[in-house]
């Protein structure tokens, strides 16, 4: 019974997990591993979920903590090949400004800190500020201030 509830939950909210994986990992194989690790961590914590927060807030918290801790363990260094590939991907977009803008936005978001990435991802998902505050562990006012700074940072990165 518990397992059926969990599987249903994952099926219903797998998009949330995929978005966290995409935001924190470029390599598709590592992204799949991260997805599996997040599901595993959710399963380990599922029996202790008491419903004090919304289920999506709980899922975001575990997914982000898993992605961020995995990131810290591997301490990735951006390779010049990755930057060249990104540049080629952008220049090969045949003048499709929308596609280029999306790629530039993804690139800019990847330049943010782990917490900033988590916050902007939730904001793009239209998660209310009170839920972002609860997930990240800061006040709602602090979320507003940080979101303004993050938006400015992204604008600046996209201009350069």
How would you label these PLM feature ranges?
Residues 136-160:
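DNA-recognition helix of helix-turn-helix
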Residues 111-131, 135:
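Short amphipathic alpha helix immediately N-terminal
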Residues 76-102, 128-129:
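Internal acidic/polar
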Residues 1-19, 32, 55:
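A short, charge-rich alpha-helical start-of-domain segment used by transcription regulators
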Residues 9-28, 45, 109:
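Amphipathic, Lys/Arg- and hydrophobic-enriched alpha-helical face
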Residues 48-50, 61-81, 98, 149:
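Arg/Lys-rich amphipathic alpha helix in sigma70-family domain 2
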Residues 33-40, 44, 53-65:
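Structural recognition of an alpha-helix C-terminal capping motif at a helix-to-coil junction
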């Amino acid at each position: 019974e518990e397992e059926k509830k969990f599987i249903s939950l994952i099926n219903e909210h797998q998009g949330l997990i995929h978005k966290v994986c995409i935001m924190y990992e470029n390599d598709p194989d590592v992204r799949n591993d991260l997805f599996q690790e997040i599901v595993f961590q959710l399963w380990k914590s599922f029996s202790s979920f008491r419903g004090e927060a919304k289920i999506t807030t709980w899922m975001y918290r575990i997914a982000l903590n898993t992605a961020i801790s995995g990131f810290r363990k591997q301490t990735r260094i951006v390779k010049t090949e990755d930057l060249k590939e990104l540049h080629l991907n952008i220049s090969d977009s045949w003048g499709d400004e929308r596609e280029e803008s999306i790629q530039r936005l993804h690139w800019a978001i990847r330049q943010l800190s782990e917490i900033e990435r988590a916050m902007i991802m939730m904001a793009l998902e239209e998660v209310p500020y009170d839920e972002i505050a609860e997930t990240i562990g800061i006040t709602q006012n602090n979320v507003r201030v940080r979101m303004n700074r993050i938006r400015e940072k992204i604008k600046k990165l996209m201009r350069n």
